[in-house]
Amino acid sequence: MDKIFVEEAVAELHTLQDMLRWTVSRFNAAGLFYGHGTDNAWDEAVQLVLPTLYLPIDVPAHVRESRLTSTERLRIVERVVRRINERIPTAYLTNKAWFCGLEFFVDERVLVPRSPIAELIETQFEPWLTEEPTRIMDLCTGSGCIAIACAHAFPNAEVDAIDISTDALMVAEQNVQDHGMEQQVFPIRSDLLRDIPKDQYNFIVSNPPYVDEEDMNSLPEEFEHEPELGLAAGTDGLKLVRRILANAPDYLMDNGFLICEVGNSMVHMMEQYPDIPFTWIEFAEGGHGVFMLTKQQLLDCADEFALYRD
């Protein structure tokens, strides 16, 4: 960003509303990609500016007329410059992200939370969940946001939060502590299900790496700051999903089910496995590429994935 813009902003903008407006203008001019928790310049500006000032993102309208100190303005401008010049997702600049209305710590060890699975948690997995769950598995937990949101939604359930990345699990553990969930959410290191004892869960929810090779080669710059381990999944994006489908029934109660996100790789799923009765979930709030299979359906198609059993 031109130095003159920076100097003008610090010198001439005075209120919180001034900074929000200026930030939106700069984001629009820069042609940023939005997809890490927001989908427009205004929401992106709110999620950058307010946490930078240690304010909640839902401050009352009259607070936006508050005057800022020059130090506060400079801190905001510095982050705006980094967001534009380095294409760093806002959540990594503020170390804050929101999922299911809950705040989480994030940094470049984990993906920024953005899964449409949030909508399923908020509706308590209706109509598939027919009883109060006692055991839930979040497979490929990353920051722990899905596991923790499930724990909030189902306070009587124990939630195992599984990931292969020790870096990600450190972030998940911090979030578990921040939410006071140490007695309910349990981060566990495992290569998918390989190192997990065969226990019975009401359901497994998974947002694994699923980006195929073609998409990996064309992702916007913002994604370069996220851990590749959490994104890439081979030529067709299904490298890990096949293993999940092969092994998940061993961990489900008889009336259990699997919820799994595959994003754009749903195209490959439908092409390669046309006879599997995936329930592709429609989201009122946007999103796609999430399927549901019951334990019985997984058992019925076990031969399709026998080669991928652990």
From Swiss-Prot:
Keywords: Methyltransferase, S-adenosyl-L-methionine, Transferase. GO terms for biological process: methylation. It catalyses: L-glutaminyl-[ribosomal protein uL3] + S-adenosyl-L-methionine = N(5)-methyl-L-glutaminyl-[ribosomal protein uL3] + S-adenosyl-L-homocysteine + H(+). Its EC number is 2.1.1.298. The keyword S-adenosyl-L-methionine applies. One of its GO terms (cellular component) is cytosol. GO terms for molecular function: nucleic acid binding; protein-glutamine N-methyltransferase activity. The keyword Transport does not apply. Methylates large ribosomal subunit protein uL3 on a specific glutamine residue. Belongs to the protein N5-glutamine methyltransferase family. PrmB subfamily. This is Ribosomal protein uL3 glutamine methyltransferase. The lineage of its organism: Bacteria, Pseudomonadati, Pseudomonadota, Gammaproteobacteria, Vibrionales. The gene is prmB.
